[in-house]
Amino acid sequence: MPAYRSRTTTHGRNMAGARALWRATGMKDGDFGKPIIAIANSFTQFVPGHVHLKDMGSLVASAIEEVGGIAKEFNTIAVDDGIAMGHGGMLYSLPSRELIADSVEYMVNAHCADAIVCISNCDKITPGMLMASMRLNIPVVFVSGGPMEAGKINGPGVTRKLDLIDSMVAAANPDVSDSESEQIERSACPTCGSCSGMFTANSMNCLTEALGLSLPGNGSLLATHNDRRELFLSAGRRIVELARRWYEQDDASVLPRSIATRAAFENAMTLDIAMGGSTNTVLHLLAAAREGEVDFHMHDIDRLSRRVPNLCKVAPAKNDVHMEDVHRAGGIPAILGELDRAGLIHKDVPTVYAPTLGDALKKWDILNGDEEAAHLFKAAPGNVRTVHAFSQSSRYHELDQDREGGVLRDKAHAFSQDGGLAVLYGNLAEDGAIVKTAGVEASILTFTGTARVFESQDDAVAAILGNRIVAGDVVVIRYEGPKGGPGMQEMLYPTSYLKSKGLGKVCALITDGRFSGGSSGLSIGHMSPEAAEGGLIGLVEDGDRIEIDIPNRTLHLAVSDSDIADRRERMNARGASAWKPNRERVVSKALQAYAAMTTSAAHGAVRDLSQIIVKTRI
C-alpha cells in the first residue's frame, strides 16, 4: 500500500519543524492525517482567460475540505498569447510551458502533496500542467476556466458573431473604416474566458476530457455560466476520492499514467482531428506523452489523420460557430459519441469520473437522452459584458441534435471524410509538418507556388502589408523554430494579414514556427527539421517552386538534388554563421538557455535531457 506522500512532512518527531510551519498555515491537530491536495491555480490579471480564476482556488478548496481533505493553493505564471503576439513577447510563450511544468513539479514535490487539482485555461498553461501531471503521476483532476462568450455585432437585419481574429483582420483591411474597426474591436471579446473559437486554449481543454483527466463540460461550458461552479466543486470532491483510492486502496487505475495511456492519447488526437483543433495541440500532446513515457509519436498522428473525418467546424474554420455552439451540440461527449459510433475511439479506457469512457458516454452523450446531460449542455451565453465567473444562468430552449446539417455531424454527413489536421512529409519536412486542413479551402488543397523567403515574421508582415505578396506566392518564414526563434513564435499576424489583403485563398504560408489556433488558410507549420538545425527550409531561395499536396500528404521543394547539395555545401562553408538568420534580434539569456536545450517540433519541442548527465545516487 503506498503511503501518503504528505506524511513525510506531517508525521514523526523529526518533522516537528515542518508541522510547526503547517500549523502556521492554519492546519490543526486533526488535519495531519488527511490527504494534502495541491491546487495549482493560474490566476492573473493579464489574461482574460484567467482574470476570473482568483476565487476558483478557494471554491475548489471548500469542496476538498468538505469531504475530508486539506487544500493548499499555489499559482503559476500564465502568458496571454494574443497580447504577446506580433512582437518580441511571443518568443516567451512556448518556453513558458516548460516553466509552468517545472513550477508545478517543484511545488508539489517540495511540499510532498498527495494529489493535484489543476486550474488552467489558456494556451500554454493547460499543456504545462499536463506535462507536470504526467511527470509526477499522482492523482490529478483538471478544471479549466472555460471559454469566452462569442462577440456579437448587430448588422442590417442580422447579428454577426465575432472573435479576436475578426478584430485583427478588420484592423488590417483598408476597406474597413476606423469606426467599424473600433466597433469590432470593442465587441470581439465580451467576457472573461479563453477566446471563443476552437483555438489552442479551448482545443487543449477539450482534449483533457478525451484523455480522461477532466469532467464533462470542461472544454465547452462557458466561463460566465453559473453551472461551471459545480464543475469546480465536483473537481474538489473527486480529487479526494481519487487520492483515497490510490493511497488507501492501492488502486493504481486512478493515476495519470494509468488513465492517459497510449489509447487515451489516440482518443485525444482523434478528437482533435475530428473537431479541427489547433495545430499547437500536436506539439503539446507529443510533449505530454514524452513526459509520461507514452509511446505516441508524429507517425501515430499521421496514421490517425488519414482515417478520422472532420465532424465539426468551429471558428476560425467556420466564422459563425463558436464554443458556445459546440456546447449546445453536446460538447466533447457528443463528438466522442459520434466517433464511437464510427468505431474510431477506444472506449475501454478509464477516466477520473467514470470506470471507462464508454460508461461516461452512455450518460453524457446527449443522444442517449440523459436529463442531467441535457441540462448541462443547454447552458447558454448571457450576452452581457463581464469579467466575472458564474454571472449568468441563461439556457437554450433546445439542444442541437442535428447530426446531418448541425454544428456537429455524424460520419456519414461529415464536413469531409479527411480529418481537420494533417501531417505532411517531403524533402521540406523530412520529420513532418502540420496543417489545419479544416481551415483550408478545397480549391487549394493542392497548390504550387513561388517562394518568397523571409528570416523573420516582422519582415514577412511588412511585405504583406506593403502589397509585395501576390496571388500564387508561398510565403516562407524561417529561423522561427524552437531553436531558431528561439521559442517558435506563432504566425497569427501574417495569416490574418493575408486574409485582410484578400490573399487567404490564393497564397500559402510555410514556416518552422507555429500558428495560433486562430489561424486558417493554407498555413503549414512545425516544419522539421527547422532551419537552425539544418532543415531544407534554410536553403529555400526566392523564386523556387514549392509543391503542396495535402490529399497525398506531401510538401516538396522542386529543386534538383544536385542544386540542393550545392546550396548545403555553401551554407556549411559559412562556419560560425551557418544555419543562422540574417536579422537583428536581441535574445535574452533565459531564451538562449531554452534554445540550447529544446528539441524539434516533431518531438514536441521538449527539452533534450540527453545533454544532462544525471547522478541517480550520490
UniProtKB/Swiss-Prot annotation:
It is an enzyme of class 4 (lyase). Pathway: Amino-acid biosynthesis; L-isoleucine biosynthesis; L-isoleucine from 2-oxobutanoate: step 3/4; Amino-acid biosynthesis; L-valine biosynthesis; L-valine from pyruvate: step 3/4. Binds 1 [2Fe-2S] cluster per subunit. This cluster acts as a Lewis acid cofactor. Its EC number is 4.2.1.9. GO terms for biological process: isoleucine biosynthetic process; L-valine biosynthetic process. The keyword Transcription does not apply. SUPFAM superfamilies: IlvD/EDD N-terminal domain-like, LeuD/IlvD-like. Mg(2+) binds at residues 81, 123-124, 490. GO terms for molecular function: 2 iron, 2 sulfur cluster binding; dihydroxy-acid dehydratase activity; magnesium ion binding. It holds the Pfam family ILVD_EDD_N. Its cofactor is [2Fe-2S] cluster; Mg(2+). [2Fe-2S] cluster binds at residues 122, 195. The modification N6-carboxylysine is found at residue 124. Coiled coil: none annotated. It catalyses: (2R)-2,3-dihydroxy-3-methylbutanoate = 3-methyl-2-oxobutanoate + H2O; (2R,3R)-2,3-dihydroxy-3-methylpentanoate = (S)-3-methyl-2-oxopentanoate + H2O. The active site is at residue 516. It comes from the Bacteria. One of its GO terms (cellular component) is cytosol. Keywords: 2Fe-2S, Amino-acid biosynthesis, Branched-chain amino acid biosynthesis, Iron, Iron-sulfur, Lyase, Magnesium, Metal-binding. Belongs to the IlvD/Edd family. Functions in the biosynthesis of branched-chain amino acids. Catalyzes the dehydration of (2R,3R)-2,3-dihydroxy-3-methylpentanoate (2,3-dihydroxy-3-methylvalerate) into 2-oxo-3-methylpentanoate (2-oxo-3-methylvalerate) and of (2R)-2,3-dihydroxy-3-methylbutanoate (2,3-dihydroxyisovalerate) into 2-oxo-3-methylbutanoate (2-oxoisovalerate), the penultimate precursor to L-isoleucine and L-valine, respectively. Homodimer. This is Dihydroxy-acid dehydratase.
